[in-house]
Amino acid sequence: MKPVIALVGRPNVGKSTLFNRMTRSRDALVADLPGLTRDRHYGEGRIGERPFIAIDTGGFEPVVKEGIVAEMAKQTKQAVVEADVVIFIVDGRLGLAPQDRAIADYLRKTGRRIMLAVNKAEGMKYTSVAADFYELGMGDPYAISAAHGDGVRELVDEAIELAVQERPELAEEASDEGKGVKIAIVGRPNVGKSTLVNTLIGEERVIAFDMPGTTRDAIYVEFERGGKPYTLIDTAGLRRRGKVFEAIEKFSVVKTLQSIADANVVILLLDAQQDISDQDAHIAGFIVESGRALVVGVNKWDGLDGHTRDRIKHDLERKLQFLSFANFHFVSARERTGIGALMRSVDDAYAAAMVKLPTPQLTRVLQEAVEFQQPKRVGASRPKLRYAHQGGSNPPIIVIHGNALSGVAETYRRYLENRFRAAFKLKGTPLRIEFRTNKNPYADSKD
């Protein structure tokens, strides 16, 4: 599991700048809850070999009781609930503000591990930067510059250390708990995840998940279907931890991200009776970014007329075209229709994700693809694609060697991906293609 770090502070202290710097390795935004323009954002980052999840929040004014600012405060409180460590950011140039005191008072009551970061501290002496903020009672401040990166690595390193002290299991590798294929069922609230879980495991079990505990402790449920073992990773909802925040929503982005990372195959469940939302697309995007095998289930399909079904299929093709590699199934978890085909696709997706691709066959498919359609010239030279081999599994990675490969266009990369998919019948898994210009047996050959 990955430590979760929430960034909290009043408006315009540099939270988003710090968030973008922390998560730059993963393109920053991986999930964005709908609603306000200043809802909380989630991203993944990495310091060395240590991954983490960061949450960016809107400007926090905890004493405001109504309006958009109050809604932003609610989002921030939710982020604090989900976090292992909270980084409280203040502005070193403007000094201590009354809002900072109010935020500090609130954070002290949460029981979370809090780190105080004084941003915009570039060019300032530490003693002068820190002096204003000791009275907040948050310990020694960390002087940073989110814009320039000064002090950020040390800050995040320490945040991860504090998180591991709080929850030692965060230092462990992805869980090997359970038997067979590990499945995560994800989706926004009320799409029928719990009903599908009960249908798969054959008993009213999900209610047992909703017990007091931490917000992110995974629960593994083993079951068999057709004589095959599987392990289901619980994503049934967010549990309350203490009395930090009473009105906790049932959908937890952090819980979803953690379960996707731990799964072999993800079932993305959609609601046929609701339009595809930005939230659906964000969850789907993270699954693809994570490289997880995927099956899409469109639930509540029973009772819909032919015209409605055609419209839904058209919307799926239009809004989720980047999931064309996945199998879509139209099911009813309540009526238990379509579940067998859904699970067969789970097996197929897992097999595709773990496939072994021999180098001679990969190279032959590559050469046939180039012979059929060469990459476009870049300036005076044309990229030369020489040979291919497998660089990893789950998802499959195909490494292509050659010359001048930095000039290969994205459209040509997609063309090659489609050729490899068709040749090896890779359905249900993302496929990564990497281009590598290096010394190889063909490097000095003549065309």
Swiss-Prot record:
GO terms, molecular function: ATP hydrolysis activity; GTP binding; ribosome binding
Signal peptide start-end: none
Database matches in Pfam families: KH_dom-like, MMR_HSR1
Keyword Repeat belongs to the record: yes
Domain annotation KH-like: ranges: 355-439
Subunit structure: Associates with the 50S ribosomal subunit.
Stated family: Belongs to the TRAFAC class TrmE-Era-EngA-EngB-Septin-like GTPase superfamily. EngA (Der) GTPase family.
PANTHER family: GTPASE DER (PTHR43834:SF6)
Protein name: GTPase Der
Gene: der
